[in-house]
């Protein structure tokens, strides 16, 4: 497995699914519109946005990206990931308010007014034909100002519980798309935009044919890692007899790789440990079981691959949206859900020892039934409709 050294490798398998071909041969590469994509804060907003950005550019669009700049010591994720992909990166001075204290709330009206003023200047300079919002605090002021200036606003909500910005903007939007059903009153359920690699994986029955020996466990902590998983998984494995342990690949995030190595060494357990995984689609496909959080992109990718997953939602996620995301699959028999407060080394060791490969294949098949693969195509088509 090729392990990547930086966050940017998570974009390696772009362009996205559908890889919409330019229309009408060489002449179709002529620019026929300008899109401003608004997304930032987390990979759950950024990676679907990048999938759409590549698809639009392949169709001849100019693409600008609006995100947060972050700080000199801690730049935003989007400011690191987007420019290397060749898209013009713009930023305004605005940040989230949840959990920031009373002082931040008191200053919110002034900060929002300033961000709206900056957004107007940006929109007049870029002159987008379509403004495409994918959630995150940064989308609120620019989305409101795009409506005020008469721009077409298209939204995509990645989670099963809509964020504040999309809840506000949805009532003014030209079109609204969602990754899960019944999220917004006027939303069209299309799934999440996916990178191409997730569409090139054999189905679960083909992958599991002929598999034997120890189970293969893939632990995904995400770009920032999941400390609870990093602590509990090595201890759970240590409770199993060596011959009953699965073959483990554990991805921790760069900040926690040293602590993870110490945890496994202390438990006396062997595993493949890495801060990042270059090809997540192939890693999921090669595993019998995936142990992970339940961010929107992860849940969508699990369904696209048809992988059996044990979801441990991040307990501090806004509106507990990760639990809701996971239930979309789990309620259909496509995985397991275990709250972090209930996850213990003893429970996990027992689960790993009792679970058979045939059951894991079945869970993967159920997940595959819930895949939605044409989100990029439908959203790009909507962008093109509004400029005709």
UniProtKB/Swiss-Prot annotation:
Gene3D superfamilies reported in the protein's UniProt record: Glycogen Phosphorylase B (3.40.50.2000)
Q: Which InterPro entries match?
A: GlcNAc_MurG (IPR006009), Glyco_trans_28_C (IPR007235), GlycoTrans_28_N (IPR004276)
What is one Gene Ontology biological process annotated in the Swiss-Prot or TrEMBL record? regulation of cell shape
Binding site residues for UDP-N-acetyl-alpha-D-glucosamine = 42-44, 159, 195, 223, 277, 322
Pfam families noted in UniProt = Glyco_tran_28_C, Glyco_transf_28
Q: In which pathway does it act?
A: Cell wall biogenesis; peptidoglycan biosynthesis
Q: What protein name applies here?
A: UDP-N-acetylglucosamine--N-acetylmuramyl-(pentapeptide) pyrophosphoryl-undecaprenol N-acetylglucosamine transferase
Q: Which organism is it from?
A: Albidiferax ferrireducens (strain ATCC BAA-621 / DSM 15236 / T118)
